[in-house]
Amino acid sequence: MRSARFRLPTSRLARLVYASVILTSVSLVSIFHARPRVWAVDAVPVAFWAWRTQSPNEVDVQAAVEKAKAQVLFLRASQIDYQDGKLRRIRPFTGSLPKGIKLHLVYNTTRPVLEQLESIDPQTLAAEITRAYGEDSERAKRDGADVKGLQLDIDFPTRLLPRYAQTINALRPQLQPHTEVSITGLPTWMDSPSLNSVLQSVDFWVPQFYGGEIPTHFSQTVPISSPESITYFVNKARQLDKPFYAGLAAYSVALLYNASGSLISLRGDMNPALITSDANLELIDQRSFSSAERRYAFRARANGVTDGLNMRAGDVLVIDLPSSETLRVAARLVRRMAGKKLLGICVFRLPVSDDPATLTVEQVTDALNDHDSSPAIYVRVKRQQQSNNTHVFALEFKNGGAASPIMGSLKVDLIVPAGSFEGITAGQDVSFQPLCAASGPRPCSERRADLLRLTIDFLAPGQTLTTTLLLNRDLPATTGVSVAMQTETEQSYSAHNEIPIEAGVK
């Protein structure tokens, strides 16, 4: 049997039509596979997500606006709880709503609601959320705040996403016209066909590009976010073709495992400094991930409490610390791959002065501006009230930069008169070694030492530590200080300065 041969059309019109079809097909294929336009650094709007009962103060919000150029704030308004078969609003925010920034009020649910989502009527849930939003909108008017919309932060199981769509559709008609409705999105939803129906019900969404996998056993080493997971999630979000803010993490996560390695609890609000300085916790492991995120593991020596967390002897507390570089890498990937439906980057969480678990606003700003995280360790020496013949000095160490030292790598050398050392009140997070500077610093007795080396376990950006130095004679007007450390990006940093001895308490 003779094989069939393909022949081009013979007429001129047919050839033109055929060529047009081929060109159109090639164009469509090219468009489908074309790489998205890369966003310029300064072209991506910035938003923050605030999740505390207390409304953020004006100073912290203004810092985010002025330094990070924040335009939008997603602010926790309250939770919806389920008790005795009824839904009710609990834990409403306290304080005045911030002005000078566009607000979206966020509502989530308690665990009892999540456990009953399959049986709770979507209309009833929508009505309770609408009632809470109405009350909060009136408060916003009195506070002079600019509320643009409502956001739902409800962790519906993937199989129940159709009920989430029903809830949002029931919510819409109860809101004022032009109210923007959005949701946060879990990484586990990305591959569900049901997600499309949810997204059709909202104006935009904020998918979380982190926390896609929780390490349920101590042996698992899973970062909060990784370049690989962010690449996957950003590509999925772009393909869904719905306007979105890219949700990026800027806070540490602490995970408590029992002695057998099973996960007990997870917290995102623990103070890393309290963990590293706890004498009951023994550092047993530290490692870095590819994007300068670091993981530290501590074993509890005995039963105890650290930053409100109860631990038993043998439990292991793991803390994953992001860095400015972690966020920088994530933001760079978003700008490169998000495409035209990107509305901006939403940083989880808003930096505030009393939240040591979150990156500082300076760290976030450097990251979003694609700047290197610069180290800056400042040392101050202040004279204190003299006790008998003992001269007392307060030593203050402050991390004023955007880079953290790797735990245990920060060393500060302070020159003192030979033989003057009497004592130092170093805490668990500060240790010291007496040195003799001649012929290169080398260990020597305290009575001969003319150089004190202080090793600081942990000093995060924005953190300040103070310790007390006792000498048997006064310091001169100035003294030499040397600082050396390894940053979380494993870069070496060193500096030497002549600093003045400041007047203190007489």
Question: Can you annotate each of these PLM segments?
Answer:
Residues 166-277:
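Substrate-binding surface in catalytic domains of secreted glycosidases
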Residues 448-491:
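Low-complexity, intrinsically disordered segments enriched in Ser/Thr together with acidic residues
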Residues 56-83, 136-147, 337-341:
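Catalytic domains of carbohydrate-active enzymes, especially glycoside hydrolases
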Residues 418-453:
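A surface/secretory-pathway sequence property marking extracellular, secreted
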Residues 39-53, 78-201, 207:
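Chitinase-like catalytic core of GlcNAc-active glycosidases
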Residues 389-406, 414:
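Asparagine-centered strand-capping/turn motif at beta-strand->loop junctions
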Residues 247-253, 259-372:
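Substrate-binding cleft of secreted/luminal carbohydrate-active enzymes
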Residues 73, 152, 205, 246, ...:
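Conserved, mostly hydrophobic/aromatic
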